């Protein structure tokens, strides 16, 4: 985290994709253990149902597993047939596990990809990553909240407190000298010298 996202050129369910071609945009890269699995299916439906919300935030979605592109195509068709949902974003066919290894997404026991999430900023820096247990589906609301918090930081250079929601106050960085800390005394939003809330 905080490092440049490893670049890649891969085959996907929508044709070849190069990560660096997304420079200037936010990217949500997420891996799943396998096509035609119950938890993953609910996640892809959930991501699709919130796709417009991601688009409104300027976020491009990229799914990934080590299944073949033909498996992805068949799964996408199956989801459309049984749930009436058309997956709008590319799914990477990482059959040689190259991208999964670059991003440390391989489960050593099963050999499959783990349930990982990476948020990559417009400068192609990894800003957030999280791994979910294989048996636990992702919380899309929380992923969107984190994206909004990171974009708030990007625009305002402010951190966000626990349980922050859009529209709430941010936190200014702590002073790095005694003099700077003394200057804060009595300023609006100051709770103590190292904690200052800013609207």
UniProtKB/Swiss-Prot annotation:
It is found in: Cytoplasm. GO terms for cellular component: cytosol. Its main location: cytoplasm. Signal peptide: none annotated. Substrate binds at residue 115. Thiol-specific peroxidase that catalyzes the reduction of hydrogen peroxide and organic hydroperoxides to water and alcohols, respectively. Plays a role in cell protection against oxidative stress by detoxifying peroxides. This is Peroxiredoxin 2. It comes from Thermoplasma acidophilum (strain ATCC 25905 / DSM 1728 / JCM 9062 / NBRC 15155 / AMRC-C165).
């Amino acid at each position: 985290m905080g490092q440049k996202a490893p670049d890649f050129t891969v085959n996907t369910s929508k044709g070849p994709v190069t990560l660096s071609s997304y420079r200037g945009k936010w990217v949500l890269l997420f891996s799943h253990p396998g096509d035609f699995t119950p938890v993953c299916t609910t996640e892809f439906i959930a991501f699709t149902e919130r796709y417009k919300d991601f688009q409104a935030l300027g976020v491009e979605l990229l799914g990934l597993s080590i299944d073949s592109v033909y498996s992805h195509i068949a799964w996408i068709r199956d989801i459309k047939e049984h749930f009436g949902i058309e997956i709008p974003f590319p799914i990477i066919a990482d059959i040689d596990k190259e991208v999964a290894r670059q991003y440390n997404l391989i489960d050593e026991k099963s050999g499959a990809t783990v349930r990982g999430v990476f948020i990559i900023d417009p400068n192609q820096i990894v800003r957030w990553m999280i791994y979910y247990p294989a048996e636990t589906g992702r919380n899309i609301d929380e992923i969107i909240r984190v994206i909004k918090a990171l974009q708030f930081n990007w625009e305002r250079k402010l951190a966000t407190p626990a349980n922050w929601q859009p529209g709430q106050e941010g936190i200014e960085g702590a002073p790095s000298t005694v003099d700077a800390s003394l200057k804060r005394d009595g300023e609006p939003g100051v709770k103590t010298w190292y904690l200052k809330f800013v609207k």
